[in-house]
Amino acid sequence: MSDVFKKFLKLEAASGIILIMAAVLAMILANSGLASGYQAFLDTPVQVRIAALDINKPLLLWINDGFMAIFFLLVGLEVKREMLEGALSSRVQATFPAIAAVGGMLAPALIYTFFNYSDEAARAGWAIPAATDIAFALGVMALLGKRVPVSLKVFLLALAIMDDLGVIIIIALFYTQQLSLEALAVGILATLTLLWMNRRGEDRIGLYMLVGLVLWVAVLKSGVHATLAGVVVGFMIPLNGKRYASPLKHLEHALHPWSAYLILPLFAFANAGVSLDGIGLSSLLSPVPMGIMLGLFVGKPLGVFTISWLSVKLGIAQLPSGVNFKQIFAVSILCGIGFTMSMFIASLAFEHGGLDYGSYSRLGILVGSTLAAVVGYLALRMSLPNREADQSTEGL
């Protein structure tokens, strides 16, 4: 296993702890005497004006549309690297996690739709339980240390990357508002410029970021969700260059700490603050949180494991070396940790929704993700060899 991958796993595991702390802090603030201050902080207007350009949004939307675009830039870089030289670089390597990812998105979406089919406004949240939070999932897996086979970690990483691709496609197709053709034309021109730079071998990252900023503003104004600009820029950064051995890896390594220790925790802090005032068991059992909770905790493992098992039995794919189906099932439960990615989709699905869909969706995400994390950890622990525990008791 490469040093790059080892560093990535360690970083994502540490990020999971900070994410939990940020989410817990948000919950405490939202349910304390500081709740109004917490909400006022998120509603703080932030305006950027350059000549005729004027962007005026509350801080919450700057976090969701701006900072998360940087996170999706990192996702684009990771996906491209894995497709060119990593876990998705060959058909044999990519087939198993790709099939698992498809099953892991379909089953939760169907379960959610089953509970909310009669409510047109609530149906907009069908994709919420389809996402996986890679930082949390890898963080839980990291608690078991060296007992976890490397091939199992690679499977989870590859599956999560394929899952991210699916989320990107879902956002582009289903959560796009009314389009502005003028802004869209500027976005297309910026994309073509990035493609031209890539084709001619341009490896100055600063130039890509400059054109990428133009693309982000254009996409923001066009009605397409602005985070997609980050994905496009990520795909356009060249893997090999002259100034750097790999501009893509150089930028990826530079962005990882910012994403892991600032962007995702800040997003969690801004979106996880659910007020529990007036929320009881009946609230949790209402269609939106119930659909999300069961989609994550039941639908994810059902979809991932069932499709994985069938693909192996039918000879379409093969199990990673050193991995058994008990471990695949445990990982499939961990895939139900939707947290930040599910909350991101919820912020799009219910951006203009009425009632308490936003709060209810976050409640379902928190409960479903927590159940998936706890049960997934226990299932994985029981499925793994106990050699590390044996070694740790030798000196006692």
From Swiss-Prot:
The keyword Cell membrane applies. The chain crosses the membrane at residues 14-34, 59-79, 95-115, 124-144, 154-174, 178-198, 205-225, 254-274, 278-298, 328-348, 363-383. InterPro entries: Na/H_antiporter_dom_sf, NhaA. GO terms for cellular component: plasma membrane. It comes from the Bacteria. The keyword Disulfide bond does not apply. It is a multi-pass membrane protein. GO terms for biological process: regulation of pH. One of its GO terms (molecular function) is sodium:proton antiporter activity. It is found in: Cell inner membrane. It catalyses: Na(+)(in) + 2 H(+)(out) = Na(+)(out) + 2 H(+)(in). Keywords: Antiport, Cell inner membrane, Cell membrane, Ion transport, Membrane, Sodium, Sodium transport, Transmembrane, Transmembrane helix, Transport. Na(+)/H(+) antiporter that extrudes sodium in exchange for external protons. HAMAP family: NhaA. PANTHER family: NA(+)_H(+) ANTIPORTER NHAA (PTHR30341:SF0), SODIUM ION/PROTON ANTIPORTER NHAA-RELATED (PTHR30341). Belongs to the NhaA Na(+)/H(+) (TC 2.A.33) antiporter family. This is Na(+)/H(+) antiporter NhaA. It comes from Aeromonas salmonicida (strain A449). The lineage of its organism: Bacteria, Pseudomonadati, Pseudomonadota, Gammaproteobacteria, Aeromonadales. The gene is nhaA.
